[in-house]
């Protein structure tokens, strides 16, 4: 059986091969690009305004950590499963006048405006003025979540709070 190009006039032989290569490249591009895009939650792009790596303050000394949109998506998912019951829409149900805004996080005693401070708070929740244990927020002991698991929601909450300065 003759090849398809042998039936076509000479001027059509190159374009048919070109279209075949364009089709193959398009399929490869779609196959490689879509899994990456699927891992980033649209919420992270739209509301946290993250499309690439972002630096967030780690501690009071000014050290920072860099997070990818994928890491923030994972943090958002963990926040939804562990924190959303009390922090719907950035509010704090036990104390509605205190939100997750950076202004409110900075005003806490001790301040909770760095990743390290938020992670410490998750291990030992204190009242806003730091005087007593917070009965509205349950502590997250290492037996429930290891340090890595506890650390994931903090960057998402921190980035969320940055939108409400």
Swiss-Prot record:
It is a peripheral membrane protein. It is found in: Cellular thylakoid membrane. Heme c binds at residues 83, 86-87, 137. GO terms for cellular component: photosystem II; plasma membrane-derived thylakoid membrane. Gene3D superfamilies: Cytochrome c-like domain. It holds the Pfam family Cytochrom_C550. Residues 1-38 form the signal peptide. GO terms for molecular function: electron transfer activity; heme binding; metal ion binding. Its cofactor is heme c. It comes from the Bacteria. PROSITE patterns: CYTC. The keyword Electron transport applies. Keywords: Electron transport, Heme, Iron, Membrane, Metal-binding, Photosynthesis, Photosystem II, Signal, Thylakoid, Transport. InterPro entries: Cyt_c-like_dom, Cyt_c-like_dom_sf, Cytochrom_C550. GO terms for biological process: photosynthesis. Binds 1 heme c group covalently per subunit. Possible low-potential cytochrome c. NCBIfam families: PS_II_psbV2 (TIGR03046). Belongs to the cytochrome c family. PsbV subfamily. This is Cytochrome c-550-like protein. The lineage of its organism: Bacteria, Bacillati, Cyanobacteriota, Cyanophyceae, Synechococcales.
């Amino acid at each position: 059986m003759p090849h398809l190009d042998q039936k076509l006039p000479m001027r059509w032989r190159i374009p048919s091969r070109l279209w075949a290569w364009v089709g193959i490249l398009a399929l490869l591009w779609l196959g490689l690009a879509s899994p990456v895009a699927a891992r980033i939650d649209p919420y992270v792009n739209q509301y946290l305004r993250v499309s690439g790596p972002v630096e967030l303050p780690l501690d009071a000394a000014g050290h920072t950590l860099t997070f990818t949109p994928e890491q923030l998506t994972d943090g958002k998912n963990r926040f939804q499963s562990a924190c959303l019951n009390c922090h719907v829409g950035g509010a704090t149900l036990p104390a509605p006048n205190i939100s997750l805004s950076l202004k409110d996080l900075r005003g806490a005693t001790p301040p909770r405006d760095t990743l390290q401070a938020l992670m410490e708070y998750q291990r030992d929740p204190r009242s806003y003025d730091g005087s007593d244990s917070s009965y509205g927020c349950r502590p997250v002991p290492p037996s429930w979540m290891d340090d890595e698991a506890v650390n994931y929601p903090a960057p998402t909450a921190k980035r969320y709070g940055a939108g409400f300065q």
